Regions:
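N-terminal/domain-start alpha-helical segments
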Residues: 1-120
C-alpha cells in the first residue's frame, strides 16, 4: 500500500484528502505545520506528499525547497493560491504538480496516481 503525507493546516481539507486516499487504497498521515511536515517526511518513508502552501510557520514553498534537498518523491502542491506566479514558483522549486482549491477529489486522486506512476 502506498503511503502519502498530507501537509495541510485546515483539518477539514486534510480529512477530505485522507478520506479519498483511503477509499483508493492509500495509507496517509497528516502534518498540520510545515515544520511537522518536514520532520515526518524525513523520519518516514512516504511515496508522495500533498503540500499546502499557506501553512503556519514555514510556508509550503520553503517546505518543498527543504524536502527537495534530500527526497526524490512526488510532491503535489494543493493550495488556494491561484496566480500563475505561484504555480511557476512551486514547479520551479521541484513540485511535480500544482492543484488549486477548491479541487475535485477525483482529479486529486488521478493526479496522485499519475505522479506515482512517473516515479516507478
Amino acid at each position: 500500500m502506498k503511503k502519502v503525507l498530507i501537509i495541510e493546516d485546515d483539518p477539514q481539507i486534510a480529512k477530505i484528502e485522507r478520506d479519498y486516499l483511503v477509499v483508493n487504497d492509500f495509507d496517509s498521515d497528516i502534518a498540520a505545520t510545515g515544520d511537522e511536515g518536514i520532520r515526518m517526511a524525513l523520519a518516514n518513508q512516504y511515496d508522495l506528499i500533498l503540500l499546502d502552501l499557506m501553512l503556519p510557520g514555514i510556508d509550503g514553498f520553503d517546505v518543498c525547497r527543504k524536502l527537495r534537498e534530500t527526497l526524490d518523491i512526488p510532491i503535489i502542491m494543493v493550495t488556494a493560491k491561484q496566480e500563475d506566479i505561484d504555480t511557476i514558483k512551486g514547479l520551479n522549486l521541484g513540485a511535480d504538480d500544482y492543484i488549486t482549491k477548491p479541487f475535485s477529489p477525483n482529479v486529486l486522486i488521478a493526479r496522485v496516481k499519475s505522479s506515482l506512476a512517473r516515479y516507478e
